[in-house]
Amino acid sequence: MSASAAYPGHGRELPTGYELVPALLCTEPCSFDITAARERLTERGGYEIVLESPGLEVGVYVLVAPEPDHQQPHVDDEVYVVLEGSGILTIEGERIEVHEGTAAFVPAGANHQFTGYEHLTVLVIFSRR
């Protein structure tokens, strides 16, 4: 991954070709729509933050074959909820089959990667330490 920008608050690098779209910042109860993010990412793939709060980040992650998943371990715990598609999520060597409706927890610092997908859309929920 080469860096063209950094994700807010985490020091994570944004791959070249990805763009930051302003996310909704919530400090009180709020609702948010992920439809626009899903539509923007459907063809090209990528990650877009849709909600930020002091303790949480929510994003939409779309993987389109043959582009590989370039993730590196993160400093925060995260949960993936598969919205569309199927594949394999490998966490620290353990392979988990994922499909629409599957959720998976990845602890901070864990090596993890999606493989075996054609088109995979995932809701990503990061804690902020």
Task: Report each predicted region and the residues it spans.
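Short acidic-glycine-tyrosine-enriched beta hairpin
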Residues: 93-108
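A generic "binding-loop/recognition-motif" signal
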Residues: 66, 75, 94, 110, ...
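Short beta-strand/loop turn elements enriched in aromatics
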Residues: 54-55, 65-76, 128
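Structural motif
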Residues: 53, 91-93
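Ligand-binding loop in jelly-roll beta-barrel domains
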Residues: 108-129
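A cytosolic small-molecule/anion-sensing beta-strand core signal
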Residues: 83-84, 99-100, 118
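A short, N-terminal "cap"/entry segment at the start of jelly-roll beta-barrel domains
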Residues: 1-60, 70
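Short, conserved beta-strand element in jelly-roll/cupin
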Residues: 63-64, 74-89
